[in-house]
Amino acid sequence: MKKIEIELNERSYPIHLGTMECLEHAGAVLVVTNPKVGGLYLSYVLERIRAREVFVCTTPDGEAYKTLESVEMILESAFNHRLDRKSLMIALGGGVIGDMVGFASGIFQRGIGFVQIPTTLLSQVDASVGGKTGVNNAFGKNLIGLFHQPKAVYIDPLFLKSLPPREFGAGVAEMVKMAVTFDREFFEELERGDLRDHSFLLKGIERCVKIKARVVAMDEREQGIRAALNYGHTFGHVIEHESGYGHYLHGEAVGMGMVMANTLACGLGLLKESEAERIEKLLARYEIPTRYAIGDVERFYDLFFLDKKSENQKIKFILPEGIGGVAFRDDLSKSMVLSVLEAFCD
């Protein structure tokens, strides 16, 4: 099992890559999962936990359930099982479970430890690393949450064997995102290789985790360079909101958002048309949707202002500057942005 360290001083923690080894904890443990993942892997994980007591909480599956109500369900389970400040929560699932358990553990008795065991490609390469937690509400995605770093992350490739093609593609979109913003050489490797090849996939996961680890160590609270990892998300979050949470997987929405961001970047001279075509071609190879039909451009534009990166009523766009670079722009006129959105009207 390989280990990558997230360097955050007293909050540093390891990311373990490989077959999951024994997880030991002196106090009580609450494992939170959903029916689908639990049915496949709960027994596998429970066999590897050594703790005073181990309890299980099962929440509904899907982005539509990433809500305060679901977090309350987790908290009620923690109280019913008499967890205390020495207890540990474990998130066994994809990004939805990880976000909710991270949030619940961060507010339970003012904060207890938690461990991420991500079971989707998206959560293994991105969502499980870095301490972002939160839930959605009527106004938008992840607008209620906090930064709460896990104690450890266990990335076991076994979990990917049962991953449906759409979930796989959603994870690939996040891998492409990291390559475009931080690593041109990695992007070119993704163009040449095939992530459906297991050994190539494992190398890609490790590459993404190292990128994320480096960025988080530099900017834990997303005050600067970490915001680059939101490439595709400014547009993608609006797509998720407008289409209804769960209609598109998060990674699918990010993929479509990347294409929109690329169009804007091309208009500004930051990205060549040929580079935008290469990015879209790579996404399409894994059957990731790349085009979203916007119904109302004014409404779509207004929803940008709910984005967490927006400040002083200015929309901050994360745009590729070539392949391997990134630019932050908050000075774009409404007319310029609308002209891009109109290119995606149905």
Curated annotation (Swiss-Prot):
Function: Catalyzes the conversion of 3-deoxy-D-arabino-heptulosonate 7-phosphate (DAHP) to dehydroquinate (DHQ).
Binding site for Zn(2+): E174, H233, H250
Alphabetized SUPFAM superfamilies for the sequence: Dehydroquinate synthase-like (SSF56796)
Cofactor dependence: NAD(+); Co(2+); Zn(2+)
Lineage: Bacteria, Pseudomonadati, Campylobacterota, Epsilonproteobacteria, Campylobacterales
Protein name listed in UniProt: 3-dehydroquinate synthase
Subcellular location: Cytoplasm
Pathway terms, separated by semicolons: Metabolic intermediate biosynthesis; chorismate biosynthesis; chorismate from D-erythrose 4-phosphate and phosphoenolpyruvate: step 2/7
